Design a protein with these regions (language model features):
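Residue-level recognition of tetratricopeptide repeat
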Residues: 6, 46, 79, 83-86, ...
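Terminal, low-structured helical/coil segments at or just beyond the last alpha-helical repeat
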Residues: 105-128
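Amphipathic alpha-helical segments of tetratricopeptide repeats
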Residues: 23-33, 62-73, 102-110
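Structural motif corresponding to the intra-repeat A-B loop/turn of tetratricopeptide repeats
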Residues: 11, 31, 51, 71, ...
């Protein structure tokens, strides 16, 4: 189901992508596979964000973040924090998410991703 969700996201059919990602989440919750569940929460959040449904995207990112933190999936935690920094409306909260993402990526030595997040921080500072 996650593969179908990814396919529909690529062809910009957000409704079908959301349907398949949601189905994949249901299956994964029964199988106790937290890593895949975090990834699907992130993918579902991205589809919702692409569809302009930022608040719903944020909810899925927060669900994924809770799972990532509980299982010490640090790279996924950084990704989710960065994505929360992209969809959050409140400027100070956006900065907080992005700063936390920067810290995680710095600890992991993920320099390319760190630069991307620094660009996001710059956009927030400049008011974009």
């Amino acid at each position: 189901r996650a593969v179908l969700g990814r396919y529909y996201a690529k062809i910009k059919d957000n409704d079908l992508a959301m349907l398949h990602y949601s189905g994949a989440l249901e299956i994964l919750s029964e199988q106790a596979d937290p890593h895949s569940a975090v990834e699907v929460e992130m993918l579902l959040g991205q589809v919702l964000s692409d569809a302009g449904r930022k608040e719903e995207a944020s909810e899925h990112y927060l669900e994924g973040l809770a799972l990532a933190e509980a299982n010490d999936f640090r790279h996924l935690k950084g990704e989710l924090l960065a994505r929360l920094g992209e969809v959050e409306k409140d400027r100070s909260q956006r900065m907080e998410y992005l700063q936390k993402a920067l810290s995680v990526f710095r600890e992991l030595g993920a320099n390319d991703r760190m630069r991307e997040v620094q660009n996001s921080v710059h956009r927030v500072v400049m008011g974009h």
